[in-house]
């Protein structure tokens, strides 16, 4: 099983959620890449405490995300920072050659989204994905099917509400 070494930028709730999810992936038996968290970054060093307990073998703790991006052994980054920072931080991650698992929105407006897309165009080796997608959720599969078939016509806007259980 291949291991993908991750760094996390943003150690608040969403960073902890992602980290917790990686611990649940270890039971999968298929040919899947296993995530390993080796570095964390947050402006508040007190947020490292939870990660140190959950991941006692962490190699890196940074308060400046540029230091995390400079680590050659970090292959991918999960980023959970305030929306207004997405364009700059996501672009820096991509330009550093790191795979990106980000949160929506990918830019606060079209210009910011275009900047992120430009970084991706310049780094085709980088895999980038939104962590908040539901591509395998049955309702989403149906909508994807309808969109691909043309049944919905041109899609210009979507809004999805999921029931809470």
PLM ranges: what are they?
Residues 59-64:
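Conserved SAM-binding strand-loop segment of SAM-dependent methyltransferases
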Residues 158-164:
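Conserved small/polar residues in nucleotide/adenosyl-binding loops
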Residues 37, 58, 74, 152-155:
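Local beta-strand N-terminus motif with an aromatic residue
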Residues 2-4, 126, 156:
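Nucleotide donor/acceptor-binding cores
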Residues 1-56:
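N-terminal Rossmann-like dinucleotide-binding module
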Residues 136-157:
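Oxidoreductase and adenylate-handling cofactor-binding alpha/beta cores
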Residues 76, 82-83, 87-133, 150, ...:
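Beta-strand-loop-alpha-helix segment that lines the small-molecule cofactor/substrate pocket
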